[in-house]
């Protein structure tokens, strides 16, 4: 998609062209609009990746092209043949945050064709490079994104996403084999991945509301009529489970809220249903884990009863007995 200096383009037009037809010039224009220069935009990119826990990515330009194509226009302090490098895991993390934080992007990535610069003297008809969308040769029902990418170094790549029966998955295919002879290779592999996930995995609930936690039955209560209060899970969690996996064997890991629980105790009065922490719930047999630790499914830990504050005489007597017990 060419940019003409005599034309004005909106930010939306540039964003649309970048997603729909991999418009490299549009990406550079957006970088300059956001940060003042492409080099400054790279610093924002690196900071964002770091905030997402991605620490080993190589970022040298905004477009994703090899620097050899950019010539003198490559960002300063980057090599003549440098290229962005991210692992499949890194790409999946970026895609996940993009969809979670900006779900409206799927309206763009699911667009099959659109006119760029429609109100200018040089409009261009764009056609989406994602052949898994409706009307294309590799159409797969439910696919609504996300982005293709191709360089000599990275090969033919595709980050796909599909929503089926309310369950969304993200797939990453890098350097698809036999792409030169079969341009559909990356989409064929993506289709296989998607079918495998839905055929072999399903979403299920783990844990139960008000279920006890094996490693944390109760919490001490300071100055209460009772000296402890039982705690439990507030609700079950939904997780993807591989078919045939034992959902009865769970690993529940509690974490108490330090603002409410001091020295492993809460202070009376405390009401039933008060949140005192959170607990992650995992299948004991699940060895795959998650892309990020903060993705582990969790639920609140709540108190199962109300504990009123004890009267002043009871509190005073407890302090006296505690004092003498500490002496011996």
What are these regions (language model features)?
Residues 200-328:
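Conserved SxxK-family serine transpeptidase/carboxypeptidase catalytic domain
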Residues 1-28, 126-145:
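Conserved catalytic neighborhood of penicillin-recognizing serine enzymes
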């Amino acid at each position: 998609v060419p940019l003409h200096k005599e034309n004005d383009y909106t930010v939306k037009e540039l964003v649309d062209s970048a997603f729909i037809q991999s418009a490299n010039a549009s990406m550079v224009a957006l970088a300059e609009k956001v940060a003042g220069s492409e080099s400054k935009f790279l610093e924002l990119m690196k900071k964002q990746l770091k905030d997402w826990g991605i620490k080993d990515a190589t970022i040298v330009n905004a477009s994703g092209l090899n620097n050899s194509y950019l010539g003198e226009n490559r960002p300063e302090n980057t090599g003549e043949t440098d290229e962005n490098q991210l692992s499949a895991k890194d790409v999946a993390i970026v895609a996940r945050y993009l969809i979670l934080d900006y779900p409206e992007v799927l309206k763009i990535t699911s667009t099959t064709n659109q006119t760029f610069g429609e109100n200018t003297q040089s409009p261009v008809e764009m056609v989406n490079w994602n052949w898994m969308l409706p009307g294309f040769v590799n159409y797969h029902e439910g696919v609504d994104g996300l982005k293709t990418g191709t360089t000599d170094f990275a090969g033919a790549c595709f980050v796909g996403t599909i929503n089926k029966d309310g369950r969304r998955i993200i797939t990453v295919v890098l350097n698809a084999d036999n792409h030169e002879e079969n341009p559909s290779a990356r989409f064929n592999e993506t289709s296989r991945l998607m079918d495998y996930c839905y055929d072999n995995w399903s979403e299920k609930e783990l844990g139960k509301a008000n279920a006890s936690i094996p490693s944390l039955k109760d919490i001490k209560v300071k100055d209460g009529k009772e000296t402890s209060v039982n705690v439990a899970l507030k609700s079950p969690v939904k997780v993807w489970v591989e078919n045939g996996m034992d959902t009865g064997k769970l690993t529940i890991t509690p974490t108490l809220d330090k603002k409410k629980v001091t020295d492993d105790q809460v202070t009376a009065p405390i009401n039933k249903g008060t949140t005192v922490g959170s607990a992650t719930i995992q299948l004991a047999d699940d060895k795959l884990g998650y892309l990020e630790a903060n993705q582990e499914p969790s639920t609140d830990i709540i108190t199962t009863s109300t504990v009123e504050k004890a009267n002043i005489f009871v509190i005073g007597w407890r302090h006296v007995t505690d004092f003498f017990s500490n002496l011996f």
